[in-house]
Amino acid sequence: MPTINQLVRQGRKSKTYKSDSPALSRNFNSIKKSYTEANSPQKRGVCTSVRTMTPKKPNSALRKVARVRLTNGMEVLSYIPGIGHNLQEHSVVLIRGGRVKDLPGVRYHIVRGALDTAAVQNRMQGRSKYGAKKPKK
């Protein structure tokens, strides 16, 4: 417990919070060749490799992930949600924040139905999360 005198002299330091998705909070100015701090909801990037990963201990699967080089120069691992995808090397994708709990190092999701990423086929429920259009009657 600090004394009143200590608080008057120094005051309390506010806690610093670490970002869950740091790649979204960094912008690159190619003219000045410098980085600026500005948050953005999504970022565009190019797939450098598309592969599968195995999840942590109690789970078992082959989860589809892509290594993406973003417009700010950072390279991140991002998850490809849904069943089936059309992504390959050099595909242009849009990523959003959001980690995958059982894949270490995967902090981002690829947005389905945006840019080169196709929507999930034959999806009836939760369509907005997978870029699927409303089916014709």
Curated annotation (Swiss-Prot):
Gene3D superfamilies: Nucleic acid-binding proteins (2.40.50.140). GO terms for biological process: translation. The keyword RNA-binding applies. It holds the Pfam family Ribosom_S12_S23. PROSITE patterns: RIBOSOMAL_S12. Residues 1-25 are annotated as: Disordered. The modification 3-methylthioaspartic acid is found at residue 102. Keywords: Methylation, Ribonucleoprotein, Ribosomal protein, RNA-binding, rRNA-binding, tRNA-binding. GO terms for cellular component: small ribosomal subunit. It comes from the Bacteria. GO terms for molecular function: rRNA binding; structural constituent of ribosome; tRNA binding. With S4 and S5 plays an important role in translational accuracy. Interacts with and stabilizes bases of the 16S rRNA that are involved in tRNA selection in the A site and with the mRNA backbone. Located at the interface of the 30S and 50S subunits, it traverses the body of the 30S subunit contacting proteins on the other side and probably holding the rRNA structure together. The combined cluster of proteins S8, S12 and S17 appears to hold together the shoulder and platform of the 30S subunit. Part of the 30S ribosomal subunit. Contacts proteins S8 and S17. May interact with IF1 in the 30S initiation complex. Belongs to the universal ribosomal protein uS12 family. This is Small ribosomal subunit protein uS12. The lineage of its organism: Bacteria, Bacillati, Bacillota, Tissierellia, Tissierellales. The gene is rpsL.
